[in-house]
C-alpha cells in the first residue's frame, strides 16, 4: 500500500478526531484510515453506524460475497410489516453493503470486474425483493392478476444498460422496463381490476420503494424512460403490446439499448423464456447489418454535441476515448454480426470483447488495450463516485479529490495518474476512429496562403482587395475592409488565449475564401461577424468550423440568406452542431418523428434535473427550427409544409412539457384518485389560433385552453393529498411556468391562455361541462369564430371525443345571417382600426383590408353560416381545407376557393420569408394587388356590401 500523500494525511487526522468522539471510539487500523480518507460516504456511514466497522473487522469483504446478497436481504426484510418499514430496511441494507463494496474496492481485495458484479447483484437483489414483497401486498389488497384461463400473472422486470450487463457503477441510476405476460383480471379482490391497472399500481409502488428520498436516503434513482413511448407510454406493457411496439416502431437506438437487457431475478420459467425469445429477433438480425455503423456514428455525434452543450470537460464516460466509446466499439460487432454469432450475444462487455478477439474481428493487442482501458476507467469511475456516493464522471479539479483518486489508482500524484489516463483514452480513441469514427472531414483546399491570409493578418488597402473581389464596387470593397478591421479590433479586446488565436488564424482565411467571391460579400460578412464575436472565446466552436469545411459553407449560406438564422446562431452557438450533417440539416424530420426525436433527446438529460430538462427542450426547439428554416431557405419545404413542421414541432414540445409538469405534480401530490378507474389523465389542451389552424410561424406564440375531467370531492393519492381540481389548476400553472421560464436558451414559447371561458377573469382550467355551458350560453360570436380554428392537441380519448362533440354542436348552431354577418364585420373593423397600418404607402399583410385576417374571417363566417345545414364543414380547423370543403359542398365556386387559397398561401409564404429576414409583415402599398382584389371581391360578396374596396 502506497503511503498517503500530504492531502490525505491531513484528511486522516480529521477522521481520527471525528471517530475518537464516538461513545465507544473504535481501534482504527492503517487500512481503515486509508479507506476513510478516500471516501466521505464511507466515513459518514460508519460514524452513523459504528457497528458496521466492527462487522468489517470481523467479517472482511470477500470477492464472491455477492452470492449471499439475496439471503442477507431476506433476513433484513423478515420482520417488515408495512411499506414504511420496507423503505427503511431497503435503504439501510443498501448503505451497509455499499460500504462493504467501497471498502473492498479501495483495498483491492476485489478486482474491478468483481466490484461491478457486486454492485449489479446488489441492485438486482433489491429490485426483486421489493417487487416480490409488494406483489404479495397488492394481491392481498387488490386480488391476484390472472389470464383468461385463471393462471396468475407475474411482473417481469428488464434491467437495461449497465444493470443489464452486470456492470453497474457505484452511484448509478437504474434503467428498467416492466412487463406482464397476458391481459386478464384480478381474482379474489373486492372488485375486479384489469391486469394493466394492477401492474401499473404495483410498478408505481415499486418505483416509490426504490426511488423516494426519505430520512434514510434512497435506494436507486429509477429511470423508466427506455420503455416503449417513454414517459408518455404506459408504465407496464403486456408481452403482446411490447412485441407490437418493437416490431412496428422500434428505433435503432432502442435496439442498441436492448442489447444489454436482462431479466431481473435470473428466472428460467416459461414466461421469462417467452419474453427473451420475443425480444431476440429485434436485437440481433439474421443478416450481417453494416447500417449500424452510421447509426452508432450518429449517436456518438449526438453525445459529442451533448458534451459541448453541457460543457462537460474531463468526462471519462462521454469524452473522447471514454467508457462510452469502448461500449460503442463492442456494440458494433454485436449488432452487425450478433445474429449469426451467438458468442457476440453476451450482455457484459469484457466477455464480448474476448469473443471479438477469438473471432478475429479485432487484433488481439487492440482487444487487450480496450479491456485494460475499460477496467482502468471503470475503477476510476467507481472511486470517483464512492467519494460522496454521487453520480458523476467528471474528474475533480480540487487537490484533495485529485489526491484521493491518484492514490486509489496506485499513482504517486495526480500528474502521473493523468498521464496514464491520457494513454488509455488515446488507445481507445485510435480504435474508435478506425472503426466508427467521424467521417473524414472535408476541409477543402487550404486557402491560408497569399492574400486571404494577408486580408486577415495585415492592414490592406482597397486596391489590394481588388484581385479577390473584382465583382465589387470600390465603395463595397472599402466597406468590406472596414468590417474586417472592426472585427480585428473587437477580437483584440477579447481574452481568447494562444490556442484560440491559433484556430482563429486558421479559420479566417478559409472564411474569406468562401465569402469574398459572393455578390453579397458585405452582407454575408457582417452577419457572420456577429456569430464569430459570440464564439471567439469558445475555441471548441472555432475548431468545429475549421475541421468541418462543409459546416463553414452551410453557416455562410444560411447567414447570408437570413439574419434571423444568423442571430439565432450568434445567440445559441450550440446550434452549429446541427450544421455537421447536411442531409439532416436541409431535410427536417418527418412530421411524425418529432415526438420520438425529442424523447430520445431528453433521455440524455437526468429526469430529475429540471434546469437541464428546460434547457434541453429549448435547445431542441431551436435546433429543429434551424432545420426547418434551412429547408425553407433552400425551398426544400413549401410554405404549407413549413407551417406543418413548425406545428408538429410545437405539439411534440407541448406533449413533453405536460409530461414533465405531470411528473412533478404527481411526485409532490400523487395522482387524482379517480384516474384509477379511467383511461388517460383527465386533462386536455386545446390549441387555438395558428396552432389550431396548422399555421404556426417561426415566432408564433401558442394559444392554449386547458380542460379537466374530474368529479367533485376527488383527492390525490399522495402523502401531501390535495383536492383533485386544485391538482389540475396547479398542473396548468406548472405548464405555463415551464413554457415561460427564461433560461440561458431563452423561453420555450409565449403562451396565451386568454381564449379560455371568460378570458382573464375565468379559471385557468375549466371542466369540460363548464366549457360546454360557456360556449352555449355566454360566448360571443368572435369566440365561436375562434372555435373554428380550435382542435385538441393533447388529451385523454374521452376528453378528445367530448371536445369534438361540443365544437361541432356549437359550430352547427343555426344563426340568423344578417346578425352573424354584422357581428363578424364589426369585429373585423374593430381589429383593423386597432392593428391596421394607417399609412397610405404601407400594406400590412396580416392586418390590413385584403390581407390574411380578411381571408380568415371569410372562412370562419362561412363555417358559422353554413355548418347547420352541412355539419361536415366543421371537420377542419385550417383555412385551406375549409375553402376546399366550401367548394366540395357547393357553397363557394371552385374558382373562388382556389383563388382565395392562392392568395392566402402566397401571403403566408411572404410572411415566413419576412420573418427569416427579421422584418415585420408591413410591405409596400403596391404589393399583392391581384391577391388583395380577390380578397376584397370575396369580402364584398359574403360579408360587406358597403365595405370599402381595396385598391
Curated annotation (Swiss-Prot):
Residues 1-440 are annotated as: Adenylyl removase. Pfam families: GlnD_UR_UTase (PF08335), GlnE (PF03710). The keyword tRNA-binding does not apply. Disulfide bonds: none annotated. Residues 449-951 are annotated as: Adenylyl transferase. Keywords: ATP-binding, Magnesium, Multifunctional enzyme, Nucleotide-binding, Nucleotidyltransferase, Transferase. Its EC number is 2.7.7.89, 2.7.7.42. It comes from the Bacteria. GO terms for cellular component: cytosol. GO terms for molecular function: [glutamate-ammonia-ligase] adenylyltransferase activity; [glutamine synthetase]-adenylyl-L-tyrosine phosphorylase activity; ATP binding; magnesium ion binding. It is an enzyme of class 2 (transferase). Its cofactor is Mg(2+). It catalyses: [glutamine synthetase]-O(4)-(5'-adenylyl)-L-tyrosine + phosphate = [glutamine synthetase]-L-tyrosine + ADP; [glutamine synthetase]-L-tyrosine + ATP = [glutamine synthetase]-O(4)-(5'-adenylyl)-L-tyrosine + diphosphate. GO terms for biological process: regulation of glutamine family amino acid metabolic process. The keyword Nucleotidyltransferase applies. InterPro entries: GlnE, GlnE_rpt_dom, NT_sf, PII_UdlTrfase/GS_AdlTrfase. Belongs to the GlnE family. Involved in the regulation of glutamine synthetase GlnA, a key enzyme in the process to assimilate ammonia. When cellular nitrogen levels are high, the C-terminal adenylyl transferase (AT) inactivates GlnA by covalent transfer of an adenylyl group from ATP to specific tyrosine residue of GlnA, thus reducing its activity. Conversely, when nitrogen levels are low, the N-terminal adenylyl removase (AR) activates GlnA by removing the adenylyl group by phosphorolysis, increasing its activity. This is Bifunctional glutamine synthetase adenylyltransferase/adenylyl-removing enzyme. It comes from Yersinia pseudotuberculosis serotype O:3 (strain YPIII). The gene is glnE.
Amino acid at each position: 500500500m502506497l503511503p498517503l500523500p500530504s492531502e490525505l494525511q491531513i484528511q486522516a487526522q480529521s477522521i481520527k478526531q471525528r471517530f475518537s468522539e464516538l461513545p465507544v471510539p473504535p481501534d482504527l487500523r492503517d487500512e481503515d484510515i486509508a479507506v476513510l480518507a478516500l471516501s466521505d460516504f464511507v466515513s459518514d456511514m460508519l460514524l452513523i453506524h459504528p457497528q458496521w466497522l466492527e462487522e468489517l473487522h470481523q467479517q472482511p469483504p470477500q470477492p464472491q460475497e455477492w452470492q449471499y446478497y439475496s439471503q442477507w436481504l431476506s433476513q433484513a426484510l423478515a420482520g417488515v410489516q408495512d411499506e414504511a418499514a420496507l423503505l427503511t430496511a431497503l435503504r439501510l441494507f443498501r448503505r451497509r453493503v455499499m460500504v462493504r463494496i467501497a471498502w473492498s474496492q479501495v483495498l483491492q481485495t476485489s478486482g474491478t470486474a468483481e466490484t461491478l458484479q457486486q454492485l449489479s447483484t446488489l441492485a438486482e437483489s433489491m429490485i426483486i425483493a421489493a417487487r416480490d414483497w409488494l406483489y404479495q401486498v397488492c394481491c392481498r389488497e387488490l386480488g391476484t392478476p390472472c389470464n383468461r384461463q385463471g393462471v396468475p400473472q407475474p411482473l417481469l422486470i428488464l434491467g437495461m444498460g449497465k444493470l443489464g450487463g452486470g456492470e453497474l457503477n457505484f452511484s448509478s441510476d437504474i434503467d428498467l422496463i416492466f412487463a406482464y405476460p397476458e391481459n386478464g383480471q384480478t381474482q379474489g379482490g373486492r372488485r375486479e381490476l384489469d391486469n394493466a391497472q394492477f401492474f401499473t399500481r404495483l410498478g408505481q409502488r415499486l418505483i416509490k420503494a426504490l426511488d423516494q428520498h426519505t430520512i434514510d436516503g434512497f435506494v436507486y434513482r429509477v429511470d423508466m424512460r427506455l420503455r416503449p413511448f417513454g414517459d408518455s407510454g404506459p408504465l407496464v406493457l403486456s408481452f403482446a403490446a411490447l412485441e407490437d411496439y418493437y416490431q412496428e416502431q422500434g428505433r435503432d437506438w432502442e435496439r442498441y439499448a436492448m442489447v444489454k437487457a436482462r431479466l431481473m431475478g435470473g428466472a428460467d420459467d416459461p414466461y421469462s423464456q417467452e419474453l427473451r425469445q420475443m425480444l431476440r429477433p429485434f436485437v440481433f438480425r439474421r443478416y450481417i447489418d453494416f447500417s449500424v455503423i452510421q447509426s452508432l456514428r450518429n449517436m456518438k455525434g449526438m453525445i459529442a454535441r451533448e458534451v459541448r452543450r453541457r460543457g462537460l470537460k474531463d468526462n471519462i464516460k462521454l469524452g473522447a476515448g471514454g467508457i462510452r466509446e469502448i461500449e460503442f466499439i463492442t456494440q458494433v460487432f454485436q449488432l452487425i454480426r450478433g445474429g449469426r454469432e451467438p458468442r457476440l450475444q453476451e450482455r457484459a462487455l469484457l466477455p464480448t470483447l474476448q469473443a471479438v478477439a477469438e473471432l478475429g474481428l479485432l487484433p488481439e493487442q487492440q482487444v487487450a488495450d480496450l479491456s485494460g482501458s475499460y477496467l482502468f476507467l471503470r475503477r476510476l469511475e467507481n472511486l470517483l463516485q464512492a467519494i460522496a456516493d454521487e453520480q458523476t464522471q467528471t474528474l475533480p479539479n480540487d487537490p484533495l479529490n485529485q489526491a484521493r483518486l491518484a492514490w486509489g489508482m496506485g499513482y504517486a500524484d495526480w500528474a502521473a495518474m493523468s498521464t496514464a489516463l491520457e494513454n488509455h483514452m488515446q488507445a481507445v480513441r485510435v480504435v474508435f476512429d478506425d472503426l466508427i469514427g467521424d467521417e473524414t472531414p472535408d476541409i477543402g483546399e487550404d486557402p491560408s496562403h497569399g492574400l486571404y491570409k494577408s486580408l486577415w493578418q495585415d492592414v490592406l488597402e482597397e486596391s489590394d482587395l481588388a484581385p479577390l473581389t473584382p465583382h465589387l464596387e470600390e465603395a463595397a470593397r472599402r466597406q468590406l475592409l472596414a468590417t474586417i478591421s472592426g472585427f480585428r479590433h473587437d477580437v483584440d479586446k477579447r481574452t481568447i488565449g494562444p490556442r484560440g488565436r491559433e484556430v482563429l488564424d486558421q479559420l479566417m482565411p478559409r472564411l474569406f475564401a468562401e465569402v469574398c467571391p459572393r455578390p453579397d460579400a458585405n452582407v454575408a460578412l457582417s452577419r457572420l461577424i456577429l456569430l464569430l464575436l459570440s464564439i471567439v472565446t469558445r475555441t471548441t466552436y472555432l475548431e468545429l468550423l475549421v475541421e468541418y469545411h462543409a459546416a463553414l459553407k452551410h453557416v455562410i449560406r444560411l447567414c447570408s440568406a437570413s439574419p434571423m438564422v444568423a442571430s439565432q446562431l450568434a445567440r445559441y452557438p450550440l446550434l452549429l452542431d446541427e450544421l455537421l450533417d447536411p442531409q439532416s440539416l436541409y431535410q427536417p424530420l418527418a412530421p411524425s418523428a418529432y415526438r420520438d426525436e425529442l424523447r430520445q433527446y431528453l433521455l440524455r438529460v437526468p429526469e430529475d434535473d429540471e434546469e437541464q430538462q428546460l434547457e434541453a427542450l429549448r435547445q431542441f426547439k431551436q435546433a429543429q427550427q434551424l432545420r426547418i428554416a434551412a429547408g425553407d431557405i433552400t425551398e426544400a419545404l413549401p410554405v404549407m409544409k413549413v407551417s406543418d413542421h413548425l406545428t408538429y414541432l410545437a405539439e411534440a414540445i407541448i406533449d413533453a412539457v405536460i409530461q414533465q409538469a405531470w411528473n412533478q405534480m404527481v411526485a409532490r401530490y400523487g395522482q387524482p384518485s379517480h384516474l384509477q378507474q379511467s383511461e388517460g389523465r383527465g386533462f386536455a389542451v386545446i390549441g387555438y389560433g395558428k396552432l389550431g389552424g396548422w399555421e404556426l410561424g417561426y415566432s408564433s406564440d401558442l394559444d392554449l385552453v386547458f380542460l379537466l375531467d374530474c368529479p367533485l370531492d376527488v383527492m390525490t393519492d399522495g402523502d401531501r393529498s390535495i383536492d383533485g381540481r386544485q391538482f389540475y389548476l396547479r398542473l396548468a400553472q406548472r405548464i405555463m411556468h415551464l413554457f415561460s421560464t427564461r433560461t440561458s436558451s431563452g423561453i420555450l414559447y409565449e403562451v396565451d391562455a386568454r381564449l379560455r371561458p371568460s378570458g382573464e377573469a375565468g379559471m385557468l382550467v375549466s371542466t369540460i361541462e363548464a366549457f360546454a355551458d360557456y360556449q352555449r350560453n355566454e360566448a360571443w360570436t368572435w369566440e365561436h369564430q375562434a372555435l373554428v380554428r380550435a382542435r385538441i392537441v393533447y388529451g385523454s380519448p374521452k376528453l378528445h371525443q367530448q371536445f369534438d362533440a361540443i365544437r361541432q354542436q356549437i359550430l352547427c348552431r343555426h344563426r340568423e345571417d344578417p346578425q352573424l354577418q354584422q357581428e363578424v364585420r364589426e369585429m373585423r373593423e374593430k381589429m383593423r382600426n386597432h392593428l391596421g397600418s394607417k399609412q397610405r404607402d404601407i400594406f400590412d399583410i396580416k392586418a390590413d383590408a385584403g390581407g390574411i385576417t380578411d381571408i380568415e374571417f371569410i372562412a370562419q363566417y362561412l363555417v358559422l353560416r353554413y355548418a347547420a345545414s352541412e355539419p361536415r364543414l366543421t371537420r377542419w380547423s385550417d383555412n385551406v381545407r375549409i375553402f376546399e370543403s366550401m367548394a366540395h359542398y357547393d357553397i363557394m365556386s371552385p374558382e373562388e376557393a382556389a383563388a382565395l387559397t392562392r392568395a392566402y398561401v402566397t401571403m403566408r409564404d411572404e410572411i415566413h420569408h419576412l420573418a427569416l429576414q427579421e422584418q415585420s409583415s408591413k410591405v409596400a402599398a403596391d404589393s399583392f394587388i391581384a391577391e388583395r382584389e380577390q380578397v376584397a371581391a370575396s369580402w364584398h360578396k359574403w360579408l360587406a356590401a358597403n365595405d370599402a374596396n381595396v385598391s
